């Protein structure tokens, strides 16, 4: 029994010894030492070292060591290869982007980018702040409310311009009443969305008091922002309504968001109606003109018509009832005041070019392709148009990169 146990324990001892020697040899190799012996060689008459590790393992280690090092490539060739790869990748990305841009329908984001590009020459000093403001949800709600209002406003203008017969039918009267009622509801809804922007909800960096963080009002920043904002809204409405009714849109936007004292488009229209010439007035005529204007204190405290729809004074209520009594020569019945709680649940109508297929429009200008083909220039002017389209596309990519980056424009 003891003999058999000895027969099994001896191989185990040798295996453990061999394992220990192997571990020690690997540790010595890591330290740069090798196990072996020194001996005298008579042929060369030198003292040489003979390693206990076999030569085959050393060759394998040498091969493994060589495999770690990478062959250096020519720098010029590598740069050319990377340039070709990046060029092919950019070309594929541009084709994919162009293909995606032709799919789907025209959205409000498309109109916002085109309006931003069209204002870059005149309003570029102030418009830089809009790159961070374009993604605001409150802005989208306000713009849709404005377009919703202007669609009914232009419909009402067309009814007023069309000559009505003396005998008005019941259907025509119902149509006028329906448009006027929808216009009134749209103005109240627009006033709610405009108050959100004025109070600075969700846009503290654009608010003149930083939503209560500052104690001193920054009127200069407030004035610059909203003046550019009104121009931006006018441009968006003009693009949506197929670049028509620019004068009507300018006057209505100026009337809604400005008082009569500060309504610049209205003054321009009055100057154009008078011939654009400044007439010399007598002292009596000047006094009569100044008597019609309100005092400075009253002018400062005046509110725009869009704000007075929510909290009108007694005088504004009476004026509104008088103006609404007759529309397009038709006497309207008084309507009970309905409180508009929320119009966001109501489906908004498709306004202008919004909702139409993208492939019918130029992606850079949102002009109908049929209109561009009919008015397509020839010769040298066509190359100028192509150059301008390239510049617009480059600026659009710059705006998209600014929106994608977290950094904002410098003040």
Swiss-Prot record:
Molecular function per GO: phosphatase binding; protein phosphatase inhibitor activity
InterPro entries tied to this protein: Pro_pase_1_reg_su_36
Taxonomic superkingdom: Eukaryota
Keyword Nucleotide-binding attributed: no
Keywords: Protein phosphatase inhibitor
KW Iron (keyword) present: no
Pfam family, one: PPPI_inhib
Biological function: Inhibits phosphatase activity of protein phosphatase 1 (PP1) complexes.
Assembly description: Interacts with PPP1CA.
Entry-linked PANTHER family: PROTEIN PHOSPHATASE 1 REGULATORY SUBUNIT 36
Protein name (Swiss-Prot/TrEMBL): Protein phosphatase 1 regulatory subunit 36
